[in-house]
């Protein structure tokens, strides 16, 4: 008989195999040479079946990853004429493809007879923007974010790195902030819109717009993992001991009290979905020849006629070359709360004294940039003193970055830890947490478990190096529960003005977080509420106790005194990136001495300028009681409908594509 010795395949070293198991799913995301990748990673002989099976999985992974990263659904990039003297003309020019602007451009281009130009400074959103478990990687990436700072203010944001002011992040890509924020879709409440006090914007009218919007968005709920469900139950049981209930009805910010982890978000096939993804990235829109999209376009200013009474177009730069686009219809600014205000100022629309400072001709004296508002947020930390049901058991398969999670996401229809998420929200009357009367004034949100040994959250927030180190040191001892408190109706407002006449420079931002005495008192009540929560039986079972970061200025004050916590507020009450209000909707001559009237009317038309509207969160007279992304999309939908209605009012025959 011949040699019947068993063939012993070559085996990779254990360490190499472990690394290869980690690298395999990631390499296959970008590799088309599946056979060679598999054989190189697993240096073994095979009769064929093993390699064939691995190759089949690799091909499936590769196909799934390519489909996930597919950008062909987006409208093609339009190239303006090379000859700068050849000026294109459009019926509508929309500036900004964010949460509102994407909807406006899509809705207007439904009319076949109109030409629409959409100008967006950013580019296509990256893969990470559509995966809940990966979006955090983009939050310091200037390719996709405007990382702007306010003027340093000794009365707020003192925890920021030396000589830095509060950070104001906003999106810089198709989808804008909606492509990078929490995708939370909360409408606001009836009372919110009553206080706006604008014709056509009461709850009855706004609710109709939300109903139309929700048919397209189809908001749904994230699936939390087991660990987050345990955390939710800890919050539910602890807050119940204080008389704060678990919400039984759907979440309506500002109208319901209590806690819930059933927070609606905008998703599409288990992927994060901005309004740009839902309204622009589809074949139906791509077939429209009347919609032109230019990415990477930085708008310099709006062109006005000699009298400053009509918008006639915009000037923008693309790849360093200046272009002009004209319109016989309208320019719609949807560039966001900071940039829409900046563009109006650069165009000669704003406070006269501000424009004179920069030698800009004043076409319309309006309070542009005033009334800047943000919910703000302040973190408090509870250190786990012992293992409990919340943090004692962690399933390694629930790590979103584990190879098994990546493989599951790609092969199992975008399921698994990468697709999961967790939002826990509480709406509370800080004066009487157990009361359900009146309106909540405190939003307790983002109950985040910072695991032992992790890098923590201070680096992400841009805090001082010594604070980052202190948090990392305490995380060597145990897990931290981070809780954010946010004011639903802050009285401290800021403003936006120009830092130069160059449109490429960020606006000058002045904020005053927590300076109003009423805001300070609400934040103090928030601290006392969390202290009471930490003393409930469920929290005591986990050994949870308050951890206070070292603050030399504050630590010299009496421990746990109001003075100490007011000092803490000056350091840690920072931006929540919910900016609104700089192009306030109100009559031109308002009686409100602080804001001195409005910038746009109830149909979002800039006072005194025909053919110019602002359609984004900057028009909000005051903050909604919750996240601003949903209301911003509502404004986009309602603003687009107003423009379409105005065409019908002119007896034009509407022809839809």
Curated annotation (Swiss-Prot):
Keyword presence, Magnesium: no
A Pfam family it matches: GMC_oxred_C
Lineage, broadest ranks: Eukaryota, Metazoa, Ecdysozoa, Arthropoda, Hexapoda
Protein name: Ecdysone oxidase
Reaction equation(s) it catalyzes: ecdysone + O2 = 3-dehydroecdysone + H2O2
One of the GO biological process terms: ecdysone metabolic process
Role summary: Involved in the inactivation of ecdysteroid molting hormones by converting ecdysteroids into 3-dehydroecdysteroids.
UniProt KW keywords: FAD, Flavoprotein, Oxidoreductase
Positions of disulphide bridges: none
Enzyme Commission (EC) number: 1.1.3.16
Protein family: Belongs to the GMC oxidoreductase family.
């Amino acid at each position: 008989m011949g040699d019947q010795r068993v063939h012993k395949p070559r085996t990779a070293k254990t360490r190499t195999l472990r690394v290869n198991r980690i690298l395999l799913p990631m390499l296959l995301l970008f590799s088309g040479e599946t056979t060679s990748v598999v054989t190189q990673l697993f240096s073994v002989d095979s009769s064929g079946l093993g390699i064939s099976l691995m190759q089949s999985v690799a091909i499936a992974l590769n196909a799934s990853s390519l489909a996930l990263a597919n950008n062909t659904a987006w409208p093609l990039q339009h190239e303006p004429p090379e000859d700068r003297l050849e000026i294109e003309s459009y019926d509508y020019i929309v500036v900004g493809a964010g949460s509102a602007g994407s909807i406006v451009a899509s809705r207007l281009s439904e009319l076949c007879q109109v030409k629409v130009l959409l100008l967006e400074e950013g580019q296509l959103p990256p893969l990470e923007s559509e995966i809940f478990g990966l979006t955090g990687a983009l939050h310091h990436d200037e390719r996709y974010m405007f990382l702007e700072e306010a003027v340093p203010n000794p009365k707020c944001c003192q925890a920021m790195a030396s000589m830095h002011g509060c950070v104001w992040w906003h999106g810089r890509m198709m989808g804008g902030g909606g492509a990078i924020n929490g995708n939370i879709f909360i409408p606001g409440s009836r009372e919110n819109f009553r206080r706006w006090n604008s014709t056509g914007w009461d709850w009855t009218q706004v609710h109709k717009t939300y109903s139309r919007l929700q048919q397209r968005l189809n908001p749904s709920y994230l699936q939390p993992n087991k660990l987050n469900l345990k955390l939710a139950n800890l919050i539910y049981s602890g807050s119940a001991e204080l008389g704060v209930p678990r919400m039984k009805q759907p979440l309506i910010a500002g109208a319901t009290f209590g806690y819930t982890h059933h927070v609606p978000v905008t998703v599409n096939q288990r992927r994060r979905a901005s309004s740009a993804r839902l309204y622009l990235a589809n074949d139906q829109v791509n077939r429209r020849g009347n919609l032109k999209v230019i990415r990477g376009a930085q708008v310099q200013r709006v062109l006005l006629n000699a009298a400053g009474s009509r918008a006639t177009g915009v000037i923008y730069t693309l790849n360093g070359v200046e272009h002009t686009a004209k319109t016989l219809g309208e320019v719609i600014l949807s560039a966001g709360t900071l940039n829409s205000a900046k563009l109006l100022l650069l165009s000669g629309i704003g406070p006269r004294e501000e424009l004179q400072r920069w030698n800009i001709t004043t076409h319309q004296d309006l309070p542009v940039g005033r009334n800047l508002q943000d919910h703000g947020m302040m973190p408090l930390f509870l250190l786990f003193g012992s293992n409990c049901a919340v943090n004692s058991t962690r399933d390694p398969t629930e790590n979103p970055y584990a190879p098994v999670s990546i493989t599951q996401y790609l092969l199992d229809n975008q399921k698994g830890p990468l697709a999961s998420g967790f939002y826990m929200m509480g709406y509370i009357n800080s004066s009487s947490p157990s009361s359900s009367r009146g309106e909540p004034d405190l939003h307790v949100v983002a109950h985040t478990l910072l695991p032992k040994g992790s890098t923590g959250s201070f680096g992400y927030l841009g805090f001082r190096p010594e604070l980052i180190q202190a948090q990392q040191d305490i995380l060597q001892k145990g897990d931290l529960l981070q809780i954010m408190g946010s004011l639903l109706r802050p009285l401290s407002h800021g403003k936006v003005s120009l830092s130069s006449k160059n449109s490429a420079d960020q606006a000058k931002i002045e904020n005053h977080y927590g300076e109003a005495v009423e805001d300070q008192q609400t934040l103090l009540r928030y601290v006392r509420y969390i202290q009471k929560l930490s003393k409930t039986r469920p929290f005591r079972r986990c050994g949870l106790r308050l951890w206070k970061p070292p603050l030399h200025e504050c630590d010299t004050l009496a421990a746990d005194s109001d003075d100490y916590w007011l000092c803490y507020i000056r350091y840690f009450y920072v931006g929540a990136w919910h900016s609104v209000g700089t192009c306030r909707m109100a009559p031109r001559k308002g009686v409100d001495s602080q804001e001195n009237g409005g910038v746009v009317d109830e149909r979002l038309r800039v006072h005194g300028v025909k053919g110019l509207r602002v359609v984004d969160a900057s028009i909000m007279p005051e903050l909604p009681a919750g996240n601003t992304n949903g209301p911003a999309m509502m404004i986009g939908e309602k603003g687009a409908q107003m423009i379409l209605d105005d065409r019908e009012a002119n007896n034009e025959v509407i022809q839809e594509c």
